[in-house]
Amino acid sequence: MTPAELKRLYHIIKVQLEYGLDELMPEHQLTKAPLLARKSLFWLKNKHQDKELGHRLRLALQELGPVWIKFGQMMSTRRDLFPPHIADQLALLQDQVAPFDGQLAKRDMEKALGGRLDNWFTDFDIEPLASASIAQVHTAKLKESGREIVLKVIRPDIRPVIDADLKLMHRMARIVAKSLPEARRLKPVEVVHEYEKTLLDELDLRREAANAIQLRRNFEGSEELYVPEVIPDLSSETLMVSERIYGIQVSDIETLEANGTNMKLLAERGVTVFFTQVFRDSFFHADMHPGNVFVNPENPDNPQWIGLDCGIVGTLNSEDKRYLAENLLAFFNRDYRKVAELHVDSGWVPHDTNVNDFEFAIRMVCEPIFAKPLGEISFGHVLLNLFNTARRFNMEVQPQLVLLQKTLLYVEGLGRQLYPQLDLWATAKPFLETWMMNQVGPQAVINAVKERAPFWAEKLPELPELLYDSLRQGKAMNHRMDQLYQGYRDSKRQQATGKFLFGVGATLVVCSAILVSSPYEQLSMGCGIAGVTFWLLSWRAYRR
């Protein structure tokens, strides 16, 4: 390790000990190393003993900086790994850090654009509108049209910091996996690898721009969701230019109510938008926390969601969508047998899973949920309980389902914050039933025919020629098969002849050896010559 890496590692361990995070290790697995480090090397005590462990973990991650804050945010969605009191504290982590110098931001923007800002913009505000761990946002106007826009620029020199911390994370994950057998189930190395991929994706603003363009296209003209327009000609890997929007933050309940917003419709539309993204588009915004969601104030009776920051998105293939919809419908119909069978059929759990045991486990975990009124059941926690139970039966971590679960928890939490009486199931069930009908009913056949019709129309003129070629190739194949079979029969016949000649030759050689000391020397010589001759003939038969 380099001196810089050792210094950073020292700081990380120091912060962990100051916040008493060694308590996260099971007592029977607590080795002498943390105790020795605390007492003899650092002389550090837990300075926050009055705070609950989850609170201490959150404060420690905040002190360690942006890379660790975002790691904690990701871990808050993995409620299969942490108890609720820790996951709830991690969910409170805010990706807000002190802004960096606006002149540095301007320098990097001009570098990305290849020229001075005033070639494209006017009224550039050197003071940032918002600042986060990865990027910072400034406002300006387009020079040609006067349209208000925002410029999002990656923090300067952030990549070396991220690379250094990720390297340390990987080393620490390997140490934890090796030294703590109980931690291997949590797959710390795989968790860090998943986080690294997500974080590095956020460093390329071209990816976020492409996601925003796709999401905007999916909801073009929609009254339910608006996505600000990206200006791709001015965007690059380190700079994204997009339309500026004015809205009310979705968590600002007081302002929304003062504006006369229809809170019930707003909450229900959040659910509709989510399921539309998942099941209609197979492409969903996977970072729908309150900081990324605003409400259009212009028409409060018909409120419209505004989605920002499309850096993290999720996708589902058609099989996953179908199994997910069937799972949810079966669960709310309390058909646990079907839920278990669907998990096996989808490959989410191994095919040799005992379905009876799996059904019983699901029933034991999920049946108590129905003790509550249907409107109070948490859709997100339904998925959480299902996936946690499935993991006991060796369900592999499905990244796309983890993102889906996280997003559903966000949407459900926002919806019930806006309208506590929100019955998410009543809103979602008709959508799921209609979608399933379109997938497996007569309409599904019609849709499939419509989808494939252009392809078959293109291939129709070629069908006679393709049919003729197939028949000709089939005839040639039959002739070739006859030749191969005849060759096989000839080969077997030659092998049989060779074996016979070899046996006769061997017999004659043995007779020659027996007769060599007898009065019949000439007969012995004749047998020997004949035996060698038969051997040569058998060798020739094998060679053919």
From Swiss-Prot:
The active site is at D287. GO terms for cellular component: plasma membrane. Residues 123-501 form the Protein kinase domain. Its main location: membrane. Pathway: Cofactor biosynthesis; ubiquinone biosynthesis [regulation]. It is a single-pass membrane protein. Keywords: ATP-binding, Cell inner membrane, Cell membrane, Kinase, Membrane, Nucleotide-binding, Transferase, Transmembrane, Transmembrane helix, Ubiquinone biosynthesis. Belongs to the ABC1 family. UbiB subfamily. This is Probable protein kinase UbiB. It comes from Vibrio atlanticus (strain LGP32). The gene is ubiB.
